[in-house]
Amino acid sequence: MSLPNPADLIRQMAVDLRAHLARRGITEPRYIGIRTGGVWVAQALQQELGDTSPLGTLDVSFYRDDFSQNGLHPQVRPSELPFEVEGQHLVLIDDVLMSGRTIRAALNELFDYGRPASVTLVCLLDLDAGELPIRPNVLGATLSLAAHERVKLTGPAPLALERQDLATASAL
């Protein structure tokens, strides 16, 4: 199975997001990308939409519920939200939805900043391996992978997807 082209997915996601926001009457959404791949997708999506509003970024490392098991990511950076969260319509963007734990962590962090009017979830890929009841409002594609496979977004320019085989990596 070949992996989809992120640029093609983002073009369709822009169409779908525009329609989703219009149906809900949202005219001034605030975009937030989850580091690192979600920020790249958010930048590409904003460019496709022609939206030049400031982009917020979240690093959810301290909010993850598996922090004690996996430890701290070596490149933790502060979150940056150049706008108020309280009462805003947020578009939360990530690259790959797998367990749902990153999104849960992002929502927890966002609510520490205030109570948004709404949160629209946008994901480039859903790996259909959810452990939590989290589903994107706008999705590029769903992939079904073997238990030992993962997909990684590389970028930021150009964005590309690469398949990783954990069985091969652990054998090295």
Swiss-Prot record:
Find motif (PRPP-binding) and give its ranges.
Answer: 90-102
Q: Give the record's keywords alphabetically.
A: Glycosyltransferase, Transcription, Transcription regulation, Transferase
Residues in the signal sequence? none
One of the entry's Gene Ontology molecular-function terms is: uracil phosphoribosyltransferase activity
Gene3D superfamilies linked: 3.40.50.2020
A Pfam family reported for this protein in Swiss-Prot or TrEMBL: Pribosyltran
Kindly indicate whether the keyword Transcription belongs to this entry.
Answer: yes
Q: What is its EC number?
A: 2.4.2.9
Question: Which reaction equation describes what this protein catalyses?
Answer: UMP + diphosphate = 5-phospho-alpha-D-ribose 1-diphosphate + uracil
> Which class of enzymes does this protein belong to?
transferase
Keyword Oxidoreductase belongs to the record: no
> Which Gene Ontology BP terms does the record give?
regulation of DNA-templated transcription
Its function?
Answer: Regulates the transcription of the pyrimidine nucleotide (pyr) operon in response to exogenous pyrimidines. Also displays a weak uracil phosphoribosyltransferase activity which is not physiologically significant.
Report the PANTHER family cross-referenced here. Answer: BIFUNCTIONAL PROTEIN PYRR
What family classification does the UniProt entry report for this protein? Answer: Belongs to the purine/pyrimidine phosphoribosyltransferase family. PyrR subfamily.
Q: What is this protein called?
A: Bifunctional protein PyrR
Species this chain originates from: Pseudomonas putida (strain W619)
Question: Which gene is the coding source of this polypeptide chain?
Answer: pyrR
